[in-house]
Amino acid sequence: MIRQELSTSYQELSEELEQVVENSEQADERDKELVQVQGPGVVPGVDNESASSSIRFSKACLKNVFSVLLILIYLLLMAVAVFLVYQTITDFREKLKHPVMSVSYKEVDRYDAPGIAFYPGQAQLLSCKHHYEVIPPLASPGQPGDRNCTTQRINYTHPFFNHTMQSALIVQGPQEVKKRELVFLQFRLNQSNEDFSAIDYLLFSSFREFMQSPDKAGFMQACESAYSSWKFSGGFRTWVKMSLVKTKEEDGREAVEFRQETSVVNYIDQRPAAERSAQLFFVVFEWKDPFIQKVQDIITANPWNTIALLCGAFLALFKAAEFAKLSVKWMIKIRKRYLKRRGQATNHIS
């Protein structure tokens, strides 16, 4: 659009310049013929000469004013182009500094079984079993039951306190999210000197990686350093629904995070009074949905769009400067021709 306007302005200027040149040449020829016809002794009328001079002066003034307006318009366009260049560069730098967070979801049929690390302390694992959709009623709460879960005990040094030993019970978590697989565990704590009873647990992304690791103690130290620990209280059934979030870091590494939704239901203890001194813990782990959330930072700044805008702005600056230069030259040329015509008219009168 800018090129079309500039080409049109160039054509108008060239046509006006040719018209002015033709008019001046025709006027020169008419003056010469008039002088030849009147003879050397005849002087043209002062009034006619003054009138023609004033008309030519008015036309020249109008053309000069029009040229000045054109120059001002194109100077304004140059200022807009400069502002556009500055704004484009500023926006591009801001987009580079502040990337936008992109969140996507990937559906899976089954998860890689997570690892659940329990820190029961003096509590004892009574039962551990995988169920689907529903949990059957408790047959004998507080008594040892079935253990069809894959478990392993491991002792390692606390990653932050070198003189503290951690004793963890690692349990394989659920996999079949479409079948609503869940893991139900029951613990019993016979005696406790504490005012509040709770068991800590930790979730990490892959039980298989733990089993294949040659340094399981170091693996658990790294997990405890990277993941947060949670608690579930005695006397309740805590239902934990897990969801997986993968975040892509700036250096290309992928960090895994578990998000949990917990619901707590009070356990109605119907055991004999002699057995109620032992505290019971119930916990259920289940996947919330079959969608893995992926989070990454993306840069919305497109370098090709920025380059195209800059090229267009610089082209507009160049064309505007060229047109302004041509307009100034045209004004100077018109001014010289006007002064020349005025001098010739003065000579004729004298």
From Swiss-Prot:
Residues 86-301 are extracellular. GO terms for molecular function: pH-gated chloride channel activity. Keywords: Cell membrane, Chloride, Chloride channel, Glycoprotein, Ion channel, Ion transport, Membrane, Phosphoprotein, Transmembrane, Transmembrane helix, Transport. It catalyses: chloride(in) = chloride(out). It is found in: Cell membrane. Disruption phenotype: Mice are viable and appear mostly normal. Cortical neurons completely lack proton-activated chloride channel activity. Neurons are partially but significantly protected from delayed cell death induced by 1-hour acid treatment. The modification Phosphotyrosine is found at residue 10. The chain crosses the membrane at residues 65-85, 302-318. Residues 1-64, 319-350 are cytoplasmic. GO terms for cellular component: chloride channel complex; plasma membrane. It is a multi-pass membrane protein. The keyword Repeat does not apply. Glycans are attached at residues 155, 162. The modification Phosphoserine is found at residues 9, 14, 24. GO terms for biological process: chloride transport. Chloride channel gated by pH that facilitates the entry of chloride ions into cells upon exposure to extracellular acidic pH. Involved in acidosis-induced cell death by mediating chloride influx and subsequent cell swelling. Belongs to the proton-activated chloride channel family. PANTHER family: PROTON-ACTIVATED CHLORIDE CHANNEL, TRANSMEMBRANE PROTEIN 206. This is Proton-activated chloride channel. It comes from Mus musculus. The lineage of its organism: Eukaryota, Metazoa, Chordata, Craniata, Vertebrata.
